[in-house]
Amino acid sequence: MGFRLLCCVAFCLLGAGPVDSGVTQTPKHLITATGQRVTLRCSPRSGDLSVYWYQQSLDQGLQFLIHYYNGEERAKGNILERFSAQQFPDLHSELNLSSLELGDSALYFCASSV
């Protein structure tokens, strides 16, 4: 019985082009098997206190997941219970995706602002 592969691709929302946004998202690309857990990390540009996470599945628009400001959750969108996020004292944020399913294949974006 083969493993079905799940493709979770992570790109930086503002850093995809030649302009240096200062936002760093890692990993940039990720392929993993269903059932696994992955962590996506976002380091905002210097001075930015807000971090936003978005998901874009195939043939769908950008879906807001969650917003943090200065370490506190400020707004929650359509985020699955299997997904969680947090913002740390140094203001970087992590999006944790657990028990991955084929339907979780998407682009995951982070953005930051003052």
UniProtKB/Swiss-Prot annotation:
GO biological process, one term: cell surface receptor signaling pathway
Main localization, broad class: membrane
Sequence ranges assigned to domain Ig-like in this UniProt record: 22-114
Keyword DNA damage: no
Coiled-coil parts of chain: none
GO cellular component, one term: T cell receptor complex
Cellular compartments annotated: Cell membrane
Annotated signal sequence range: 1-21
A Pfam cross-reference name: V-set
Alphabetic keyword roster: Adaptive immunity, Cell membrane, Disulfide bond, Glycoprotein, Immunity, Immunoglobulin domain, Membrane, Receptor, Signal, T cell receptor
Disulfide bonds: C42-C110
Keyword hit for Membrane: yes
Sugar-modified residues: N96
Subunit structure: Alpha-beta TR is a heterodimer composed of an alpha and beta chain; disulfide-linked. The alpha-beta TR is associated with the transmembrane signaling CD3 coreceptor proteins to form the TR-CD3 (TcR or TCR). The assembly of alpha-beta TR heterodimers with CD3 occurs in the endoplasmic reticulum where a single alpha-beta TR heterodimer associates with one CD3D-CD3E heterodimer, one CD3G-CD3E heterodimer and one CD247 homodimer forming a stable octameric structure. CD3D-CD3E and CD3G-CD3E heterodimers preferentially associate with TR alpha and TR beta chains, respectively.
PANTHER family per record: T CELL RECEPTOR BETA VARIABLE 9, T-CELL RECEPTOR BETA CHAIN
Known function: V region of the variable domain of T cell receptor (TR) beta chain that participates in the antigen recognition. Alpha-beta T cell receptors are antigen specific receptors which are essential to the immune response and are present on the cell surface of T lymphocytes. Recognize peptide-major histocompatibility (MH) (pMH) complexes that are displayed by antigen presenting cells (APC), a prerequisite for efficient T cell adaptive immunity against pathogens.
Protein name: T cell receptor beta variable 9
